[in-house]
Swiss-Prot record:
The lineage of its organism: Bacteria, Pseudomonadati, Pseudomonadota, Alphaproteobacteria, Rhodobacterales. The keyword Ligase applies. The active site is at K76 (charge relay system), S154 (charge relay system), S178 (acyl-ester intermediate). This is Glutamyl-tRNA(Gln) amidotransferase subunit A. The keyword Protein biosynthesis applies. One of its GO terms (cellular component) is glutamyl-tRNA(Gln) amidotransferase complex. Its EC number is 6.3.5.7. Belongs to the amidase family. GatA subfamily. Keywords: ATP-binding, Ligase, Nucleotide-binding, Protein biosynthesis. GO terms for biological process: translation.
Length: 491
């Protein structure tokens, strides 16, 4: 096994035993990144920074070293990294190098992590296939019949990099499923924490009431380790919760006897593929065999979640993206003689924003306009409150976690949805958006392969602030599924 193929936990132990140096581990990842160019997962590599951090980690080894000392990670391009290009995969931020560090990356560096570079993503995190990036498509390391497949979105580069062993783990963000869907498509683990568990400061905003950062890893244990380093109160983020961060790794006891797992009847969608239904049934059996009690529950407002999400998220995006005007930073259009400031705004945004971002900004502006605010935006906010109430009632009735599919299918081909109705692409989020609307933690765990040999995942949804319990349930599911498959290397 090459060093870049290790999990965080395995690498941590090997580093502690002196069997491996952080420099060797980092070099193995940098070599893998060079070989992995066809995946287009990394869009900016930082070998000098990485090796400096690795040497510092080797010097620190021993007492007082952080939980991630010497562990090489990839960072989604949505996170601001001081002095390193941070473009949110958008032409409008081309060349932007922040003069500050996001809270998440600061915490990772404090824990001793090594930054290998920045990862591809959908532009401004708007997409489910990583096809809206100014850097071009990220490619799933899993392949069928020589077709290039999507790694999912928006954290597609993060998912592809982890699945292909280009890095030991990566950061992602999740607004409506952007950690969990790519994780399911690539056979890795991805957790969206409770809203407010991880600081959003220094992360380019999409929809501020929905965005949440989280880890994308090779195992549930790694997710627990990485989340422990990312989480915590941040006075710079007013939505960051001032509550203690438990030891997530210590919570992985593997004992879920007597725990109650809810199965929401509303997630049995019309036309659900038989493979997804069978996978869900298998997940129920695995948790029951581990001693959990399986109960049917109702989340009656689930059917309204997708339309509510695609009103609220674009509305918030249209407000957040108004700051990109060509005045202070990023791209500015070339102006003709006689052009005024309005012309500059219009030309800059037309050149800088891609089609999907423009579409969502227009939707958001429309639903916030005077004649439609009550009909669309206010109604969507009321639906959101009802969706949250459904979950609150299920948890109040004693349910400890909820099991659902993570995605309605396995990964599809790049370009296959290009001419489809945008709503068809939005349906990829059908199982995940409720979690963001309710502010809950959710995790995708790889459980099996479909008939084509592509990975499929199941989603577990937890009580608010109970990532520890959620991770333990996921740990049990992971062990029972025994998913160890890796993509056959073609790149």
């Amino acid at each position: 096994m090459n060093a870049n193929e290790l999990t965080i936990a395995e690498a941590r132990d090997a580093l502690a035993r002196g069997e491996l140096s952080a420099v060797d581990l980092t070099m193995a990842c940098l070599t893998a990144i060079d070989a992995g160019t066809p995946l287009n997962a990394f869009v900016h590599t930082t070998p000098e920074i990485a090796l400096d951090q690795a040497r510092a980690a080797d010097a620190r080894r021993g007492a007082g070293a952080g939980a991630l000392n010497g562990i090489p990670l990839g960072i989604k391009d949505l996170f601001c990294t001081r002095g390193v290009a941070s473009q949110a995969a958008s032409n409008i931020l081309r060349g932007f190098k922040p003069e500050y560090e996001s809270t998440v990356t600061s915490k990772l560096f404090e824990a001793g992590a090594v930054m290998l570079g920045k990862l591809n993503m959908d532009e401004f995190a708007m997409g489910s296939s990583n096809e809206t990036s100014c850097y071009g498509d990220a490619v799933n390391p899993w392949k069928v019949d020589d077709r290039r497949l999507t790694p999912g979105g928006s954290s597609g580069g993060s998912a592809a990099a982890v699945a292909a062993d280009l890095c030991l783990a990566a950061t992602g963000t999740d607004t409506g499923g952007s950690i969990r869907q790519p994780a399911a498509f690539t056979g890795i683990v991805g957790i969206k924490p409770t809203y407010g568990r991880v600081s959003r400061w220094g992360i380019v905003a999409f929809a501020s009431s929905l965005d949440q950062a989280g880890p994308m890893t090779k195992s549930v244990r790694d997710a627990a380790i990485l989340l422990g380093a990312m989480a915590g109160h941040d006075p710079k983020d007013s939505t960051s919760a001032d509550i203690p961060v438990p030891d997530f790794e210590a919570a992985l006891t593997g004992d879920i006897r007597g725990r109650k797992i809810g199965i929401p009847r509303e997630y049995r969608m019309e036309g659900m593929p038989a493979e997804i239904e069978a996978l869900w049934a298998r997940g129920r059996e695995m948790l029951a065999d581990a001693g959990a009690e399986i109960v049917d529950i109702s989340l009656p407002h689930t059917k309204y979640a997708l339309p509510a999400y695609y009103v609220i998220a674009p509305a918030e995006a249209s407000s957040n993206l108004a700051r990109y005007d060509g005045v202070r930073y990023g791209h500015r259009a070339r102006l003709g003689q006689g052009d005024g400031i309005v012309d500059m705004y219009e030309k800059t945004r037309a050149e800088g924003f891609g089609k999907e971002v423009q579409r969502r900004v227009m939707i958001g502006t429309y639903v916030l306009s005077a004649g439609f605010y009550d009909a669309y935006y206010n109604r969507a906010r009321k639906v959101r409150a009802l969706i949250k109430r459904d979950f609150d009632e299920a948890f109040a009735a004693g349910v400890d976690a909820i099991l659902t599919p993570a995605t309605p299918s396995s990964a599809f081909g790049l370009g296959e949805m290009a001419d489809a109705d945008p709503v068809a692409m939005y349906l990829n989020d059908v199982f995940t958006v409720t979690v963001n609307l309710a502010g809950l933690p959710g995790i995708s765990v790889p459980v099996g392969l479909d008939a084509k040999g592509l990975p499929l995942g199941l989603q577990l949804i937890g009580r608010p602030w109970d990532e520890a319990g959620l991770l333990n349930h996921a740990h049990v599911l992971e062990r029972a599924a025994g998913f160890v498959e890796k993509p056959r290397k073609w790149w």
